[in-house]
Amino acid sequence: MPQSADDLQLTLQRIDGRGYKAYREIRGAFAFEGLTLYVDHVQGDPFAAPSKLRLRVPRETARIPPELFAGAVRRMALEDFLVRQAARAIRSAEPTRRGSGKSGTLLVDAGGQEVLERTAAVVSEDWVELRVQAGLPAAGRRVLGRQAEAMLCGDLPHLAEHALRWENLPQQEARDFVACVENQEQIRAQLDERGLVAFVGDGAILPRESGASDRPLRANEAVAFRSPESLRVEFPLANPVEGPDGARNVVTGMGVRKGVTLVVGGGYHGKSTLLRALERGVYPHVPGDGREWVVSDRSLVKIRAEDGRRVEQVDIGAFIGDLPQGRSTTAFSSDDASGSTSQAANIVEAVETGATGLLLDEDTSATNFMVRDARMQALVHKEHEPITPFLERVRELYERHSVSTVLVMGGCGDYFEVADTVIRMREFVPDESTQEAREIATRSPSERRVEATTPFGSITARVPLAKSFDPSRGRREVKIDARAIDLVLFGNDAIDLRCVEQLVDLSQTRAVGHAIHLAASRFMDGKAMLREVVQRVEDFFDAEGLDALDPFHRGSHHPGNFARPRGLEVAAAINRLRSLRMRQKR
């Protein structure tokens, strides 16, 4: 049974002025009017990570309409919206400094422009819950009981009142938010049957505010996207949207077809901007982002060169033949892969773990991996060049493995011969130039010779060995942390994710680290292939939710701040673990 709010106040008054560890006496549950406060974890000192609390409001108090959380997509969208409302309420409150270190801090794990499944809020049939981090007030390392009373008995009930009760929420904004996310996911569900890998809606704003901001460029500076007629498709909407001419039940825009799509155009005309939008389009976006009508197949993977990365037992023989000194590439391992070998490994690993499409930009690719022209062929004979360029494998990837490619290429017309669709960007506006590109290829045929002598065979599966995963550090049995969106600390290992470009939230990266530990401890049995292991992780997320990711999770306690990554990013992180050991399964 929870204690009363009066009990909490009395305890805080009693420990006022005592050492900081006295705050441990408030761990537990406290019943307020229409609210239960759970104090799950108390920080060790004012400078440590904030304490973990939960605010739970019963259904009859929250009174959120059930249709807003009917089904997994709507529930995820509503939970994301509630966390954003909580963050807004915290920002709008008078900033109050309540002592040393993190004293007085209130934090919720609200996201950016993407809408993700996260643990910061939970909407159940019986209650609504917000997970909060709070810096408990202190002077030096002494408890400030009165300030803590104002925070826990005043600020937090006020936060719950404004973030979890329907009567105080912006109701139309909530409905529009949920509807927008559901529309995006409905479009995504139709892409495959329509023969598409992505959709870019008419009117979308693709450019971002700056290199340091993911917010949209101001409307008066941006060019709204407009589909070429030959590529325009139409999708019905689950929820009508308001437009200048009233409500509409369909959305139109450019369909990016399966196969090989080439995006060409001059510099600064929007090629890479389009590709980046497709890269982020694997997630739904908030209303008003400009990319809420950019929807990509969930399994599209951005590929790039990655000098210096770790590669373990990957068969890159389709792209790289035997290296000097007779070094085989059918089970390639390296602690310091080159640009070309890393890009080859990135492609093979992505396909191995379920990618249905690849996104590549010439700007971040290894030139010698992408193409070898006739003059270079004449100077450096094939017997001295182990690389079979991507140009000669891109069609086989689609025809043999059903893996599509969207490639930004402004400097090499040799790709005209292998492209199914050519999109030319002019001042941020696309037009389809497939026929023109084919005519140019016919008039001016490439003089380069095809050098691939063997077909692109099957992808060699690999079995990860659990003994190579050690999450311990010092006396800690499990020490996992995410120091940045591109860095996981896993035991004594640092996993560099700078080139895994589809992670968009620090809480995703944190979840990736714990998902690796989950996979190694529960799903790696020496027989399961990496793709099977990753699928088991995805199935675990679906069945148990992200709450259970934390190895120290205790029942209903605050699980930490997690946002759901794709299995593809979990696999990418596993592949970059420096201690990783794999066994090929042929």
What are these regions (language model features)?
Residues 162-211, 216-223, 287, 301-304, ...:
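Long, charge-dense accessory insertions within large macromolecular proteins
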Residues 249-283:
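Glycine-rich phosphate-binding P-loop
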Residues 399-402, 408-586:
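Conserved NTP phosphate-binding and transfer environment spanning the P-loop NTPase/kinase superfamily
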Residues 338-350:
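Conserved alpha-helical scaffold flanking the Walker A/P-loop in AAA+ ATPase domains
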Residues 309, 319-340, 372-387:
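Flexible beta-alpha connector loops of hexameric P-loop NTPases
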Residues 1-195, 206, 578-586:
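N-terminal accessory targeting/assembly segments
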Residues 207-252, 283, 287, 295-311, ...:
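N-terminal pre-Walker A segment at the start of P-loop NTPase domains
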Residues 350-394, 398-399, 411-439:
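Conserved P-loop NTPase nucleotide-binding/switch module
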